[in-house]
């Protein structure tokens, strides 16, 4: 996934695996580094520095390590699990949505260049639902199924992360 420039990347554990994907790192550090386009669906957790310098890829992942989305300039990332510390440091473009049912995301986000708020617009809800449906379709994710089964209520647990400069547009 490093330097992804189109196509679709789907990462799932082996069929005979007994791990719980949403609790295990399944893709290593710096995945999606410098990605410019394409779609990524990861049934599991990514390591550190996920989607650093992403400028156009769209991804759904079930958790990420520290420094995720650092220096991101475009694209969209949906995290349906925990984030590590220093999330979105230097992020100047793109959009992230983070599933935060326990309201602890604020402890991990670097607020220097971004702000986060609850998802309120129909556009955001539709975009989230469409990507999570694809994630479920491609990965059979238990997390995606749980969210989709009660989407009307679960959407309230998402935070939208945008650079301050986006808000000025």
Report each predicted region and the residues it spans.
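Long, distal/terminal scaffolding or interaction modules
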Residues: 1-169
